[in-house]
Amino acid sequence: MSGQHTKEISDCRFASADLQYNSDKSKIYNQKSKIIIMSYSEKVIGHYQNPKNVGTLDKSAKNVGTGLVGAPECGDVMRLQIEVDDATGMITDAKFKTFGCGSAIASSSLATEWLKGKSVDEALTIDNMDIVEELNLPPVKIHCSVLAEDAIKAAINDYRVKNGKEAIKFEESVVH
């Protein structure tokens, strides 16, 4: 990519007719200027094209925690849910629904995969930079990984409050 300029697309939906994917769909470029707009890793493409754990859990269930976070600047909204085995404290299932760009969907998909089989306390150690590194997200898409981390914490808080436990202290990140 050296010698080429990249730019962030403010509307994450790539609606312009001038924008096209290259043959393996790893890059989005402007057809007229031939400037690469965004380059995605194979892992992002894989999670975007075949997202894992899309769906919902019963949010009224006592053992289900739901986190809903969003980034109004980009339009990304992420709902992530966890199901916890009350006897063991282990996360037995995780689901998500995300309205947003490929990086937001990939971050959600990866996060749900990582959550399954972890204890609630272990889940709190998932950091947005772990997601950035695993997916090789470009700097302009780091906010997507922050949303995933915030959604995890919000889901855990919802679960904890439903079960009479103290909520963890965290502030939803301001995403730019």
PLM feature segments, named:
Residues 51-91:
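Structured beta-strand/loop patches that form or line metal/cofactor-binding pockets in enzymes
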Residues 74, 98-106, 144:
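Short, thiol/selenol-centered motifs that function as redox-active sites or metal-ligating centers
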